[in-house]
From Swiss-Prot:
Record field: compositional bias (Polar residues): 980-990, 1433-1442, 1576-1586, 1597-1621, 1629-1639
Protein's name in the database: Tanabin
Region (Coil 2A): 180-193
Tissue specificity of this protein: Growth cones of embryonic vertebrate neurons.
GO (cellular component) term, any one: intermediate filament
UniProt-annotated stretches for the region Coil 2B: 200-314
Length: 1744
């Protein structure tokens, strides 16, 4: 292109210019026509706007519209109400649905329970049917057995008859046989027989031991195998589950690993794609940069062509002006500018008339030239070593054109060269780039220097004539370089990022240093001369006719021009070949700022051109016009100087900037205060109304621009200037007047002050630095017009300085809270800032794309259109871009401002929350002590109310009302105190804190009130909960005592007082010390009347207490830490008190029992003398203690025979009457809801023993001895019998149970008194003081010392089993001595029954008791005392064996048979007792039936008696003995077979039914206990069935073996061993048959009582005898050893139960629940098992 331009001659170009001018003329005329049309349209629009008639329709419809709005509001309100109603109905429907679901679920549960009950009923029915069938079978078996028995008996009688004949024949033998030899043989045979028996016994014992050991080992092995099998199964399941889990985890791990691999591959592919895209984009960018560079070169060449066209156009301007002067088609743009500058000061018209719009086309061209001039200066300082220094062909071409124009008399200043360029910083900023460069002064100077002084002088002579021409020329000279600069700047701006290897920061610094050095050197020459030169330079393009400017031109030396030309040439050449790389953000910012300033220049130019017609006033208004133009130019220069400020991390650069600006300001300018500026502006406003309007419009536009620029700056430079903050703080801000910036930018400082609040003063310092930098242009203007106010400047500066300090102080105060907030920057805010940066980057890309489109459009328009058309379209495009960019800037600013506000709110929220916590903690600490005091008062009042409630049981509602009222009063008090505490807490805070909370919208009073209220309510409820816990624990303590609600007594009344613990301690001491006196009996009748009232009070109290607890539980309990600790401490204290009371009771009972054992040891020494004391009555004192006093002495044996028949008949009649009464009472009680164990005392009828029936001392002696022996046999448990009822009383397992025997002989005590006093026997912990009775308890393992003492005392009258073989003679003697005592005690036995029956009903049972029916036992077979503690199988102590003459015995039995027949019918009544009552049926197995507890050593007492008699008469009475033995055997067999009338529930197929409702531990315990009973009482007709068949066989075997041993040991010394062995075999057969039948039919259950008839028992006995004809069933040989091995385990379980009993740790069981449990046989208070027997068994005894 350059070569083409060089080849084309100037003549051809002239021809082309003429044709172009013609086209331009047509274009301008078209523009004029369009302007006229626009003016008409504008007037029409104005007229339409002025008319207000069209708006009247609003008033017409306003009222209607308001009505409609009201109707709409009403409809909306109704809709809201309907929605509320709908929501409430929906909630109600949901509630009803929930209730329906609950009811449905309850119905389903009821159906399930009904089905289960039906199933249970069917099972019970089937069981009953089976039992009936079984009963029939057993009856048939019993008949068979009886038939076989008759046959066997006949055979035995025949054998006995034959044997007696043989004996008679043997006695008649010849005398040849010597008696001595016979005796020797008999003795030898007996020895041989004895040795064989001993050897057999030893072998059997060894085999039994081995077998038992083997069975035990087998059992253990089986158990271990079972456990191991279960363990193996559990481990297998666990292994399977672990394997499955392992597989699942492995699958999950593999899946996650695969997903991770896939994700990594996906990310790798994405990274590769992005890398490839990056490479592609780099290539595309390189191509685009290269294209842009080429376009830049093309643009430069085109700009040269346009310059050429402009010069030609100027040459023809004179002709065009003269030809078309009348129509003003072509007006001189220079003259227009001059007119505009004058118009700026005059401005007599607000709007430009239509006549003056003909120059719009040239004005528009001039505007575009002005817009295009300075943009290239932004990049002019960039240099590169690759650019050649030689002169380019373009420069040569311009030189040629310049020479041509000079020859024609026109001065063309210079080719468009790039002079000094202000660079744009690489930092993120929106303010660095402005269109006008900082070298405006030098450019004006260069242009002025190139003017010929001589020509100017000549033109000065004809100033008025030549002003327009010369002004036009000079304007063109200024505009041409500007246009070229603009074109070059566009091309450079589009391609500047192509050279990344050049550091823009370094180039910018270099250019800035050169610029500053040149400016400073220019003004250092002299202040006055420089000011005049600058004014001349600025004024020259406007009015050349000014003589001052001509003089200034003459003063300028032409040498500077020559020096500046080479430099400018080099700079222009370097710019033409070089680009600068900037970041994408800077490119977008550059385009925005450039368009903004172009818009301002356009507005200013339009304003200037509007004054074109005021040329005749140019001279007069020059002084007023020139300062305004200079003001505007200097404003633009200040913007350029702002651009030159480079924020960077390099402190040296900042020092260079500050240093250069400070020197520049100090040497050349004087600071001006705000007052001066206001006076100056007022002066300008007073000039004219039009000038004021123009200035306001100009400043308004400028302020809008500055606001947008400042907003951009605040968004982009906030983080960049932090690094330079410390350095910028060192700048002397006070020496500069910041109001000059306010004058030019009236809104900038306000915005900066607002930003200072959020940015900690950074932007204030930044703005200050900018003010320092911009002083050069602003103060240059103000210094010319404020020289008359210089005296006021220093004062105004001081005043302004003080004002700024106060403002900064206020800003600092106001920014205290934001500073605190800014310190707590969270991660979310950082992420938010990062997202903002990303959005800004995206916006920058979009702006860059818009700029590229603009550049492309500009290039296309440049190629296709002429110069004038290109300028016009470019200007319009720039205006549109400017509008779009300004809108985008405003949007960005609003978004950033909103984000800043959000972040500030978040920070304030965080700080507010922290302060809230501090406030709450502080208020809590202030009010905690007062709250504690109030809560203590509340606690005391609540305790008082509770005590008051306990004193008034019958008024249930009054305590609740009082308590609720007190609680409400306390709540009101607490609310008042909370308010006071809140006020005090608020006073402790500073005023700033309260204001801060109030400003942030938090109600501190409400927060504190809610917090303290919650704490107070929590502590209040905590205290009430503690009181409730205390009450519940006290109730548990009361109910843990095994006394019923009907027999609470004075103890519970004392527990209701506040001094419960002290009185409880005294009461526990009284339990061991108080002894009941007979004279106190009268008080007990009154106490029984008080008992019913007390029961009602207890019920009322429980209801009242429950209501109080419910009242306290209504509110939510929020426990404070201190309250939790307090409640725990209270509970611990209560537990300690309870444990102390229990320990005191136990220690007291231990002491009492030790004394009892010592006393008993002394009394046992008098056994041989028949002096024994017995407890014949038990009474209850004020504390419920038991005490019996009966001192009876034995004088002889003669009176026994006289009294026994009479006493027996009387007692039998009395007992028969009692049985009827008992049946009636039991049937009546069965109709009630429930009857508890302790309430059965009411069933006992009162029977008095009249004076005629008083017991004689001798009879009492036998009775006492009998009772003592019974007590021994029962391990310390008293056995009380009637004739037809036998009760088994089981006292507590603690050693508190005893009976006290005093030495007051002959004490008479009636049964009536006994029954009255025994009603209060309710607490098992109360003791029966029995100092002289031997007993054993399975109670507490802690009382072993007492038990050992008891055992030692028991060794005195009894011999252990181990030594029985050695001490047979002594044992036999003791047995003979006790025979008469045992028989005589039968007569007085019935008297015991009435007393003991009542005692049994009042004492709860803990361990199962055996039956007390058997009459016979051998003392020699008593187990060892040590074994009695270890094995309950051996726990029974044998009774004394009695023996009288056979005649006496027959008489006694005949009387008994009569009584049996009279009482036969009563047996059925006893068996028909309802299940719901606690049934007690007894049996009496003989006239003088003696309670005995037979263990494994059971045998017939009759056989033992006969053995003892035979032992006394070994040689004379053998025949009589055999006859009596046979008769006795028949009676024994019949008696033992038929006595089995008990309530049983036998299931052969389900032997373990007994324990189905028990847990594992209880099951084992109860099974073992049932086994014990079966072993101990096999000859009795009531006992529990074993847990399995093996145990039954073992029990039977043990009994047979023990009987064999006992019989053998009794008959060892008889002379005729054969006859004795035969009798023993018969007895073994009978006993084993009876034992087996008893074992098979025994079944006692905890689930209820099923009654079977006597026939069932008989059938069972017959069936058993058939199965085991030999009398010794298999599998019974090793039961004793096995039972002994199981003994420790059973004892341990028994101790555990007893310990629970002693400690009172029992669950609270209601009346109904306790009754139901008792009926099921497993009550939680541990009552003993009640077995039903009957007197009817005696009837079967006499059938044979």
């Amino acid at each position: 292109m350059e070569g083409y331009l060089a080849s084309v001659s100037l003549g051809e170009e002239s021809t082309q210019m003429w044709s172009l001018n013609k086209r331009l003329e047509a274009y301008l005329s078209r523009v004029k026509a369009l302007e006229e049309e626009n003016e008409l349209l504008r007037k029409e629009i104005h007229s339409l706007r002025s008319s207000k008639s069209e708006r009247c329709w609003k008033k017409k419809h306003h009222e209607e519209m308001m009505k409609l709005r009201d109707a709409l509001d009403d409809g909306h309100r109704e809709m809201v109400q309907a929605e509320m109603v709908r929501d409430s109905i929906y909630e109600e429907i949901e509630f009803v649905k929930q209730r329906c679901l609950e009811e449905k679920q309850a119905r389903e549960d009821a159906k399930k329970e009904l089905s289960e009950s039906k199933k249970l009923l069917e099972e019970e029915t089937r069981a009953q049917i089976w039992l009936k069938e079984r009963l029939g079978q057993l009856e048939a078996e019993l008949e068979d057995i009886l038939r076989d028995h008759e046959e066997e008996k006949a055979l035995m009688e025949e054998e006995i008859a034959s044997f007696s004949q043989r004996l008679e024949n043997f006695r008649v033998a010849p005398v040849a046989f010597k008696p001595v030899e016979v005796d020797d043989y008999a003795r030898k045979l007996s020895e041989i027989w004895q040795g064989a028996v001993e050897e057999y016994k030893s072998e059997v014992s060894v085999l039994e031991a081995g077998l038992s050991e083997s069975k035990e080992n087998l059992r253990k092995v089986l158990e271990e195998n079972k456990q191991n099998r279960l363990l193996l199964q559990s481990l297998d399941k666990e292994l399977v589950s672990l394997k499955m889990r392992k597989e699942a985890l492995e699958d999950l791990l593999s899946k996650q690993w695969q997903e991770q691999k896939e994700e990594e591959e996906k990310l790798q592919r994405k990274a590769e794609a992005l890398e490839q895209e990056k490479q592609d984009l780099r290539g595309q960018i390189a191509e685009v940069l290269e294209d842009r560079q080429q376009l830049m070169h093309l643009k430069m060449s085109l700009s040269l062509e346009v310059a050429t066209y402009r010069s030609l156009l100027e040459a023809e301007s004179t002709r065009i002006y003269t030809d078309y002067r009348g129509s003003y088609t072509f007006n001189d743009s220079m003259l227009e500018h001059n007119n505009v500058r004058r118009r700026q000061s005059e401005d007599t018209r607000k709007t430009v008339s239509k006549d003056h719009r003909q120059s719009y086309s040239k004005k528009q061209i001039g505007d575009k030239n002005e817009l295009q001039r300075p943009s290239l200066n932004n990049f002019s300082t960039v240099k590169s070593s690759a650019v050649p220094v030689r002169t380019s062909p373009v420069t040569k071409e311009f030189q040629k054109v310049s020479s041509v124009l000079q020859s024609q008399g026109l001065k063309y200043t210079k080719a468009p060269q790039v002079k000094e360029v202000q660079t744009v910083s690489t930092v993120k900023s929106n303010l660095e780039t402005h269109t006008f460069s900082g070298d405006a002064f030098r450019r004006a100077q260069v242009e002025t220097r190139k003017t010929d002084e001589q020509v100017i002088k000549k033109d000065a002579l004809g100033l008025n004539d030549l002003n327009k021409n010369t002004g036009f020329k000079e304007e063109k000279d200024i505009q041409k370089p500007g246009f070229m600069d603009h074109v070059v700047s566009k091309s450079v701006s589009s391609t500047e990022h192509k050279v990344p290897e050049i550091d823009p920061l370094e180039s910018a610094l270099k250019s800035l240093e050169e610029d500053l050095s040149s400016v400073s050197s220019t003004f250092n020459a002299g202040q006055s001369s420089n000011l005049e030169a600058i004014k001349d330079v600025l004024g020259e393009p406007i009015c050349l006719e000014n003589l001052q400017n001509e003089i200034a031109f003459e003063k300028e030396s032409p040498g500077t021009n020559a020096a500046a030309d080479p430099i400018e040439e080099v700079i222009s050449e370097s710019v033409s070949y070089q680009t600068v790389h900037f970041e994408k953000q800077e490119l977008s910012n550059l385009l925005e700022i450039e368009n903004t300033h172009e818009n301002h220049v356009q507005d200013a130019t339009q304003a200037f051109n509007s004054c074109e017609q005021d040329g005749h006033d140019r001279a007069s208004t020059l002084e007023n016009n020139e300062p305004d133009v200079q003001q505007y130019i200097r404003t633009l220069e200040s913007n350029e100087i702002k651009e030159s400020k480079i924020p960077s991390d390099n402190t040296e650069e900042a020092e260079i900037i500050s240093k250069s600006r400070k020197v520049f300001l100090e040497n050349e300018y004087i600071p001006v205060s705000k007052d001066d500026l206001t006076e100056f502006t007022s002066h300008l406003e007073n000039d004219s109304e039009s000038s004021q309007s123009f200035d306001s419009k100009l400043f308004e536009n400028k302020s809008t621009e500055d606001q947008l620029i400042t907003n951009l700056k605040s968004n982009t430079q906030e983080n960049i200037f932090q690094s330079n903050q410390e350095h910028l703080e060192n700048l002397e801000f006070d020496s500069v007047v910041p109001d000059t910036v306010k004058f030019m930018y009236p809104q900038e400082n306000n915005l900066l002050e607002e930003e200072n609040v959020y940015g900690d003063g950074e932007l204030v310092q930044m703005a200050t630095d900018e003010n320092i930098i911009n002083q050069s242009s602003d103060q240059l203007l103000l210094s010319d017009h404020s020289h008359h106010e210089e005296t006021k400047t220093s004062e105004s500066i001081a005043v302004e300085h003080n004002r700024m300090e106060s403002e900064h102080a206020e800003v600092d105060k106001s920014s205290e809270i934001p500073v605190e907030i800014s310190e707590n920057v969270s991660v979310e805010e950082i992420i938010h800032e990062i997202s903002d940066v990303e959005e800004d980057t995206k916006q920058a890309f979009e702006d860059e794309r818009v700029g590229e489109q603009i550049n492309q459009n500009n290039q296309e328009s440049t190629v296709d259109l002429d110069g004038s058309v290109y300028s016009q379209e470019e200007n319009s495009q720039l205006e549109e871009d400017e509008v779009s960019i300004s809108e985008q800037i405003e949007k960005d600013f609003e978004i950033n401002e909103q984000e800043c506000l959000k972040s500030d709110q978040i920070r304030e929220a965080f700080d507010t929350e922290e302060v809230d916590h501090q406030v709450v903690d502080f208020m809590q600490e202030q009010s905690f002590e007062r709250e504690v005091g109030q809560l203590n008062n509340i606690k005391q009042e609540v305790d008082y109310l509770q005590n008051y409630d306990e004193d008034s049981f019958q008024n249930n509602d009054e305590p609740q009302e009082l308590e609720s009222c007190d609680l409400q009063e306390q709540k009101i008090k607490l609310e008042e105190e909370n308010q006071l505490s809140e006020n005090e807490g608020n006073q402790n805070f500073g005023g700033n804190d309260i204001e801060e909370f109030s400003q942030q919208g938090y109600d501190t009073d409400e927060i504190c009130q809610e917090t303290i209220g919650n704490q107070v309510s929590a502590q209040l409820l905590c205290e009430s909960d503690i009181n409730q816990d205390k009450l519940s624990m006290e109730d548990e303590e009361e109910q843990n005592n095994p006394e019923t609600e009907d027999n609470i007594g004075l103890e519970q009344e004392s527990d209701q007082e506040n001094t419960r613990s002290n009185e409880g301690t005294k009461f526990s001491q009284e339990e061991c010390d108080v002894v009941f006196k007979p004279e106190d009996m009268s008080d007990k009748s009154e106490y029984s009347g008080q008992q019913e009232d007390l029961d009602k009070q207890v019920t009322d109290f429980s209801l009242n207490e429950q209501a109080n607890n419910d009242l306290l539980e209504k509110e939510e309990v929020i426990l404070h830490h201190a309250d939790d600790q307090r409640s725990v401490n209270d509970e611990i204290t209560i537990d300690e008190k309870l444990s102390e009371r229990i320990i005191d009771n136990e220690l007291a009972t231990v002491d009492v029992n030790e004394s009892l054992a010592a006393n008993k040891e002394q009394v046992d020494l008098f056994t041989d003398e028949y002096a024994v004391d017995d407890n014949v009555g038990m009474q209850d004192d004020d504390s419920g203690q038991y005490q019996t006093k009966e001192d009876l002495f034995v004088d002889g044996n003669n009176i026994i025979e006289k009294i026994e028949i009479q006493q027996t008949s009387l007692l039998n009649q009395e007992i028969c009457e009692r049985v009827d009464n008992v049946d009636e009472d039991i049937s009546g009680e069965a109709k009630n809801e429930s009857v508890e164990m302790n309430d059965v005392v009411d069933l006992v009828p009162e029977a008095k023993v009249t004076g005629d029936e008083q017991i004689s001392p001798l009879q009492d002696e036998k009775l006492n001895l009998e009772t003592m022996e019974d007590t021994k046999d029962n391990d310390g448990q008293l056995c009380l019998e009637k004739e037809n009822e036998t009760e088994y009383i089981e006292v507590t397992d603690s050693p508190q149970f005893a009976t006290d025997l005093s030495h007051d002989a002959g004490r008479e005590l009636t049964v009536d008194q006994n029954s009255a006093n025994l009603q209060f026997c309710e607490n098992p912990t109360k003791t029966l003081i029995a100092h002289h009775i031997e007993y054993e308890t399975v109670a507490d393992s802690d009382l072993e010392s007492t038990e050992e003492q008891v055992q030692e005392t028991e060794r005195i009258p009894f011999k252990p089993e181990d030594s029985k073989m050695e001490n047979e003679n002594s044992e036999s003697e003791e047995s003979v001595d006790s025979q008469e005592i045992s028989l005589n005690s039968h007569k007085s036995e019935e008297f015991e029954i009435s007393k003991d029956y009542q005692l049994e009903q009042t004492l709860p049972d803990v361990t199962p008791l055996p039956n007390l029916e058997d009459e016979f036992e051998d003392l020699t077979e008593q187990p060892d005392v040590h074994e009695e503690h270890q094995n309950n199988d051996d726990s029974g102590a044998s009774t004394f064996i009695t023996s009288v003459d056979e005649d006496k015995e027959r008489e006694v039995r005949e009387s008994v048979s009569k009584d049996e027949e009279s009482n036969e019918e009563e047996f059925g009544d006893v068996l028909s007792v309802d299940k719901t009552s606690q049934v007690e049926v007894t049996t009496l197995s003989g006239l003088a039936q003696e309670p005995s507890y037979l263990g494994d050593n059971e045998e017939s007492e009759d056989s033992m008696e006969n053995a003892e008699i035979l032992n006394e008469n070994p040689s004379n009475d053998i025949v009589d003995f055999m006859v009596s033995q046979m008769t006795e055997t028949k009676i024994i067999i019949a008696e033992q077979v038929t006595e089995q009338t008990e309530v049983t529930l036998q299931f052969d197929d389900a032997p373990n039914k007994l324990t189905e409702n028990l847990n594992a531990r209880e099951k084992e315990t109860y099974d073992y206990e049932s086994n014990e009973e079966n072993i101990e009482f096999t000859n009795e007709n009531q006992s529990a069935s074993p847990a399995n068949d093996i145990v039954d066989e073992n029990q039977s075997e043990d009994s047979v073996i023990s009987d064999n041993e006992g019989t053998t040991s009794s008959y060892e010394d008889l002379p005729n061993a054969t006859s004795i062995s035969h009798v023993v075999a018969l007895e073994e057969s009978n006993i084993s048959t009876t034992e087996q039948s008893s074992t098979d039919t025994k079944r006692m259950t905890y689930e209820g009582y099923e009654i079977t008839s006597l026939q069932n028992v008989e059938d069972n006995a017959q069936e058993t005898e058939k199965e085991f004809p030999s009398g010794v069933p298999l599998g019974q040989e090793d039961s004793r050893s096995e039972d002994e091995e199981l003994d420790d385990e059973g004892s341990e379980f028994s101790f555990g139960v007893n310990d629970e009993k002693a400690n009172g740790e029992h669950k609270d069981v209601g009346e109904d629940d306790e009754t139901e449990d008792m009926l099921n046989g497993h009550s939680q208070t541990g009552y003993s098992k009640i077995v039903l027997t009957s007197k009817k068994a005696l009837r079967w005894k006499r059938m044979f």
